[in-house]
């Protein structure tokens, strides 16, 4: 049998073993081995011993690191192969061209740096190419995501800025931010992001803030309502015009981490450290929990309400013969938890799917506007894409999307345009053309992520 090592390699190995034994005060064993190998003292003087003293440990750790790298690469190859198995040249081409099928790919278009601490939240302007980022460094930064340039830094909070959101009535878009300093602040983008109002009322850190969309049933100030979640276990609804708290929602028994409004503004979905998710009907005079969802084994970090475009993919899981009407909201929801799992729920509070794959806390969720996919980010540094048409199968894993934990994820909101008048539809009176009630929806294929590495990454088509 031919030797595996060359004579020189064998000699280096022997000297490394002897040096290791000597360094660990196993002198008798070292001398015995040296004698059996016929290495005299001249061939293994103090200089040689010093040279080989740590070589064995270095070789060993190198092998371990290499083995870990090989396992990681094998895992990546497996994920890529799975993606290829589910794709054809036609579907890949269509995915690149069709916004409803677009999936982000590495590398990011921009990796934006300026923050001096963890980025906690990102939010896109509903019309312009601006994106806001909130950080533990107590600042908000406004970027141009198309150019990859920093536009301005907003200061005002005295502690970490936890969440940001753009919203408000058409023509009066505002930026809302919330902080560990117990306050919510409103900033005016049309006036150099001047702080126009500060909302105070929570008794602990404010962990999430969201504008409630236009069309909230029963809302007197539709388009000017704001929802917030706090460590004080409550949710609050605010009038952005006056800064007054209109309602306080009690029900959670621990820190409320996240809140998400339905597209019509009728419902709020909330979740937190009591490991539950609650769906609230805020259209009634005395809002109360409509549904409470139990099932996670650890604190919940995030939640999202599915768009109506996803109903066709999720309704078969409930046994429905046809999906609910698009006008119906909060039919399906998703939650992400520190138990490393994502759960998909229906409006009755039934868990339809449990998605497993992340190796650490799940920090943020975003449904694809096209409805077919759900995206998630985690402390395991990955961004994952789950295909709802395949019962939540993970079809893409973007590994090392950030250098450290990924804390936030946001999809740029679609742009809604009034449908133009055209040939065909008539209201039957004098042959006048009738304008469609359905606005034209333009999906923006842009995703932003932020993390503990203090970087804001932009993935765009």
Curated annotation (Swiss-Prot):
GO terms for molecular function: dynein complex binding. Residues 9-41 form the LisH domain. Its main location: cytoplasm. It holds the Pfam family LisH_PAC1. WD repeats lie at residues 114-155, 157-197, 201-248, 251-290, 312-355, 357-396, 401-446, 448-461. One of its GO terms (biological process) is establishment of mitotic spindle orientation. The keyword NAD does not apply. InterPro entries: Dynein_regulator_LIS1, G-protein_beta_WD-40_rep, LIS1_N, LisH, PAC1-like_LisH-like_dom, WD40/YVTN_repeat-like_dom_sf, WD40_repeat_CS, WD40_repeat_dom_sf. Residues 61-88 form a coiled coil. It comes from the Eukaryota. It is found in: Cytoplasm, Cytoskeleton; Cytoplasm, Cytoskeleton, Spindle pole. The keyword Coiled coil applies. Self-associates. Interacts with NDL1 and dynein. Belongs to the WD repeat LIS1/nudF family. This is Nuclear distribution protein PAC1. The gene is PAC1.
